[in-house]
Amino acid sequence: MQKIRKGDKVVVLSGKDKGCSGEVIKVSPKENKAFVRGINMVKRHQRQTQKQEAGIISKEAPVHLSNLAIADPKDGKPTRVGFRMNADGNKVRFAKRSGELING
């Protein structure tokens, strides 16, 4: 089970976007990287095709998972993630900072 998944709200711990938060769009577990909406934006030069015009577009670049932390559901501050079994016997994620369950 992954600590950071698609749809999670995360906080950037280091880098040019330190302190910013956003939603995870995609996770690459093999590369230990994630794409976060609005974080680590880079400009790419787009060649003209039949469907798209030429120009410079901004898109998200991947961020290493070690530079991300889940945002605590209670107050939005960065927290570590723990795992425990719920009453149904399913493994669930929880925020170690507040003890709140993390959706997903």
Swiss-Prot record:
Kindly give the Gene3D superfamilies that the UniProt entry links to this protein: 2.30.30.30
Write down the SUPFAM superfamilies for this protein, in alphabetical order. Answer: Translation proteins SH3-like domain (SSF50104)
GO molecular function of the protein, one example?
A: structural constituent of ribosome
Supply the Pfam families for this chain.
Answer: KOW, ribosomal_L24
List the NCBIfam families hit by this protein, alphabetically. Answer: rplX_bact
- Provide the function of this protein: One of two assembly initiator proteins, it binds directly to the 5'-end of the 23S rRNA, where it nucleates assembly of the 50S subunit.
Task: Give the family, as the similarity comment puts it.
Answer: Belongs to the universal ribosomal protein uL24 family.
Q: Relate the assembly described in the record.
A: Part of the 50S ribosomal subunit.
Protein name per the record: Large ribosomal subunit protein uL24
Source taxonomy lineage?
Bacteria, Pseudomonadati, Pseudomonadota, Alphaproteobacteria, Hyphomicrobiales
